[in-house]
């Protein structure tokens, strides 16, 4: 009895401390829900991990990853917005460096690239797998938030005829070299700082994953849109991007698929017919190759069908034995199979709540970079969740996008914890300012009431 009371007391203490955090409580509750769902789902969906590890070992590993993720989130939560802004401007350089190492396929002993499913997307750093594309997504969203806000700040400074404190390199080059004087124009600064980095990153990602490059490109364009980039410039940049992809496609065709192989992978996935009747008449290697191609997406659809309204309940999934990585790319199908359509709808509501709440946080903030960062990160989290769901319900080709904070995967989990940490930090700052404004308003109101009361006494 005493032990139970102590445990209840500890839980209440932990809950009270969490509720005393100054960040947005709704986002905090969403994070807790997603982490709890991930524990439940990963424990139940991992009977056949590639390493053949036990469920207990898997849960220990996931528990350690969750601990690291919460630590990352906690550290970023205490960051000032100006610190996050200062780090964000290096997002493109960091992404460029990581992707360059992938393209060169380095092998330096302690760190080397790793090929998975015919594509190079990861590093092995002293045995730890690092998914570069996950890092690039968040880095580039934060970078674009900085770049657009910096361009706007520079433009405002020039209008007010004062020295700009942002984009110092572009301004210095424009002042020093006559042939680079075009860099004084806001349009060219957007080209150099916003459009070119986005196009370069997406092009470099094509070698590792064409579908990921397209998805990241879409997220970056959407981030630019919510940042207020002129739609005409976005249209031109989009046309340039399409022209670049067309040029790469031409290289793929001219080389008979020997170069830019990932383009062929994207096209093949978009054109795959997941009908099991395609196995008829096939034998040997062709039969097994086609079976492997069809098994996962077909089993994912079967899982959704068998889930029906209320699902099979925890631990009763059967399709997890058919889909080897259901804990990653097909986590939503697994959740629907075990918890039914209602469970699937709850997952949708949770991710939509992230977007809705982030809109409120963005409006609360008076810092331009903070508004863009919250909007872009929320768009990334929700967009990836819905891309994952679309693939699971057969509304799109396989992309390898995981379900944020639920699917198994260390790199993705830590990166999205960092994204949520930034959102919480910005919400904390915005809430502090609102609270200060409310206190000032209340103080002014009290002062007015005191003055009125004093005036009435004098009249009496």
How does the language model describe each region?
Residues 214, 220-233, 318-343, 401-414:
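Interfacial segments of multi-pass membrane proteins
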Residues 34, 99-102, 146, 205, ...:
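Alpha-helical transmembrane segments of multi-pass membrane proteins
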Residues 64-72, 136-137, 338-355:
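Hydrophobic alpha-helical transmembrane segments
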Residues 36-42, 141, 145, 352-355, ...:
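Alpha-helical transmembrane segments of polytopic integral membrane proteins
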Residues 360-400, 406:
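Loop-to-helix entry and N-terminal half of a specific, functionally important transmembrane alpha helix
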Residues 2-27, 40-41, 45-207, 389-403, ...:
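Membrane-helix boundary/helix-loop-helix interface segments in multi-pass membrane proteins
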Residues 69, 89-96, 172, 189-206, ...:
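Hydrophobic alpha-helical segments of polytopic membrane proteins
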Residues 114-122, 235-344, 368-369:
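Hydrophobic, glycine- and aromatic-enriched re-entrant/interface helices and adjoining loop segments
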């Amino acid at each position: 009895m005493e032990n139970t009371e102590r445990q209840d007391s500890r839980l209440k203490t932990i809950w009270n401390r969490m509720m005393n955090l100054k960040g947005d409580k709704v986002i905090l509750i969403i994070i807790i829900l997603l982490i709890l769902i991930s524990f439940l789902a990963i424990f139940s969906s991992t009977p056949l991990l590639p390493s053949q590890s036990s469920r207990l070992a898997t849960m220990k590993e996931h528990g350690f990853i969750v601990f690291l993720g919460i630590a990352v989130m906690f550290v970023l939560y205490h960051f000032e917005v100006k610190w996050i802004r200062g780090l964000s401007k290096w997002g493109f350089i960091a992404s460029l460096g990581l992707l360059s190492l992938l393209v060169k396929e380095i092998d330096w002993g302690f760190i080397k690239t790793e090929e998975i499913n015919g594509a190079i997307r990861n590093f092995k750093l002293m045995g730890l797998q690092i998914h570069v594309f996950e890092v690039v997504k968040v880095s580039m969203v934060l970078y674009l938030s900085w770049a657009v806000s910096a361009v706007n700040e520079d433009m405002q400074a020039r209008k007010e005829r004062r020295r700009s404190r942002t984009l110092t390199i572009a301004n210095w080059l424009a002042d020093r070299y006559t042939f680079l004087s075009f860099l004084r124009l806001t349009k060219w600064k957007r080209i150099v700082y916003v459009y070119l980095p986005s196009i370069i990153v997406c092009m470099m990602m094509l070698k590792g994953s064409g579908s990921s490059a397209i998805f990241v490109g879409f997220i970056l364009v959407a981030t630019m849109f919510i940042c207020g980039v002129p739609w005409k410039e976005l249209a031109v940049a989009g046309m340039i991007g399409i022209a670049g992809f067309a040029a790469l496609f031409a290289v793929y065709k001219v080389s008979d698929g020997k170069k830019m192989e990932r383009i062929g992978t994207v096209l093949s996935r978009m054109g795959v017919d997941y009908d099991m009747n395609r196995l008829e008449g096939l034998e040997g290697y062709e039969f097994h190759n086609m079976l492997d191609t069809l098994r996962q997406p077909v089993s994912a659809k079967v899982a959704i069908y068998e889930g029906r309204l209320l699902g099979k309940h925890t631990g009763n999934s059967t399709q997890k034995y058919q889909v080897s990585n259901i804990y990653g790319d097909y986590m939503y199908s697994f959740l629907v199979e075990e918890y039914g359509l209602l469970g699937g709808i709850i997952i949708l509501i949770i991710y939509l709540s992230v977007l809705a709440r982030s809109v409120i946080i963005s409006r609360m903030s008076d810092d331009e970079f903070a508004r863009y960062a919250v909007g872009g990160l929320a768009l990334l989290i929700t967009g990836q969740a819905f891309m994952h769901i679309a693939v699971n319900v057969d509304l799109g080709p396989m992309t390898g996008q995981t379900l944020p904070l639920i699917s198994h995967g260390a790199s993705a989990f830590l990166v999205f914890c960092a994204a949520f940490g930034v959102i919480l930090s910005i919400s904390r700052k915005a809430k502090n300012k609102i609270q200060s404004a409310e206190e000032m308003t209340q103080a002014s109101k009290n002062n007015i009431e005191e003055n009125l009361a004093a005036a009435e006494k004098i009249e009496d």
